[in-house]
């Protein structure tokens, strides 16, 4: 990969397909350059870790409940000794509502995507069709050079 890159082809492919699977060198640094190019092109980026998200459709686009570990503690003054459920807003919708006025969209940059199942990759490949302002970039593994491929092709091949 060239030391200086404009990232134009990467941004064009991301806008065309909506979701890209990328392979990055293990020494790092390349993904930061492309994130900087995306921000310079007018996109807002959100960097999250793919493992542990749970049910992707509910986590990204619906209000969902989260229960913290109780660690043997009880809720004082409450007759039900269960653990409270906290309801969180949908991640994608919340960030879309709070985008700057001139932003072109939101890019979800997910690391460690190699742990996602084929169904989860298929869902992430169709999410940009449901939410046109959302683009997805998933790091699927390592390689000697920074390369990308549309996620639909990768989900079909996996």
UniProtKB/Swiss-Prot annotation:
Family per record? Belongs to the complex I NdhN subunit family.
Q: What does this protein do?
A: NDH-1 shuttles electrons from an unknown electron donor, via FMN and iron-sulfur (Fe-S) centers, to quinones in the respiratory and/or the photosynthetic chain. The immediate electron acceptor for the enzyme in this species is believed to be plastoquinone. Couples the redox reaction to proton translocation, and thus conserves the redox energy in a proton gradient. Cyanobacterial NDH-1 also plays a role in inorganic carbon-concentration.
Q: In its keyword annotation, does this UniProt entry include Transcription?
A: no
Q: Which reaction does it catalyse?
A: a plastoquinone + NADH + (n+1) H(+)(in) = a plastoquinol + NAD(+) + n H(+)(out); a plastoquinone + NADPH + (n+1) H(+)(in) = a plastoquinol + NADP(+) + n H(+)(out)
The EC number(s) attached to this protein equal 7.1.1.-
Q: Which gene encodes it?
A: ndhN
Can the keyword Cytoplasm be found in this entry's annotation? no
Q: Which InterPro entries match?
A: NAD(P)H-quinone_OxRdtase_su_N (IPR020874)
- Per the record, the domain of life is Bacteria
Could you tell me where this protein is found in the cell? Cellular thylakoid membrane
* Protein species of origin: Cyanothece sp. (strain PCC 7425 / ATCC 29141)
**Record's bilayer topology term:** Peripheral membrane protein
Q: What are the alphabetically sorted keywords of the record?
A: Membrane, NAD, NADP, Plastoquinone, Quinone, Thylakoid, Translocase, Transport
Which Gene Ontology molecular function entries are recorded, alphabetically?
A: oxidoreductase activity, acting on NAD(P)H, quinone or similar compound as acceptor; quinone binding
What's a single GO CC term here?
plasma membrane-derived thylakoid membrane
Give the range the annotation lists for the signal sequence: none
**Name of the protein described by the UniProt record:** NAD(P)H-quinone oxidoreductase subunit N
Q: How does it assemble?
A: NDH-1 can be composed of about 15 different subunits; different subcomplexes with different compositions have been identified which probably have different functions.
Q: What is the lineage of its organism?
A: Bacteria, Bacillati, Cyanobacteriota, Cyanophyceae, Gomontiellales
